[in-house]
Amino acid sequence: IDIKRIIEHLPRQRLGVLITDHNVRETLAVCERAYIVSQGHLIAHGTPQQILEDEQVKRVYLGEDFRL
């Protein structure tokens, strides 16, 4: 079973899911909104595009050269 495919179909059924994962590429590819936590503190939330553009997320979590 392809879990990514299942997750992509959940919004059509008006269902949501909470994913906790360190694989940012896979997670941002299937989510509508993301919440980024660093050292127990919420540092950013928004659409995948907003997360990718967030300077603090880049500095703390992704690095400047991160690309999807």
Curated annotation (Swiss-Prot):
Subcellular location per the Swiss-Prot or TrEMBL entry: Cytoplasm; Cell inner membrane
Example of a GO cellular component annotation carried by this entry: plasma membrane
Homology family: Belongs to the ABC transporter superfamily. Outer membrane lipopolysaccharide export (TC 1.B.42) family.
Reported function: Part of the ABC transporter complex LptBFG involved in the translocation of lipopolysaccharide (LPS) from the inner membrane to the outer membrane. Probably responsible for energy coupling to the transport system.
Gene: lptB
Subunit structure, interactors included: Component of the lipopolysaccharide transport and assembly complex. The LptBFG transporter is composed of two ATP-binding proteins (LptB) and two transmembrane proteins (LptF and LptG).
Membrane topology classification: Peripheral membrane protein
Protein name: Lipopolysaccharide export system ATP-binding protein LptB
Domain of life: Bacteria
One Pfam family it belongs to: BCA_ABC_TP_C
Lineage of producing organism: Bacteria, Pseudomonadati, Pseudomonadota, Gammaproteobacteria, Enterobacterales
GO MF assignments: ATP binding
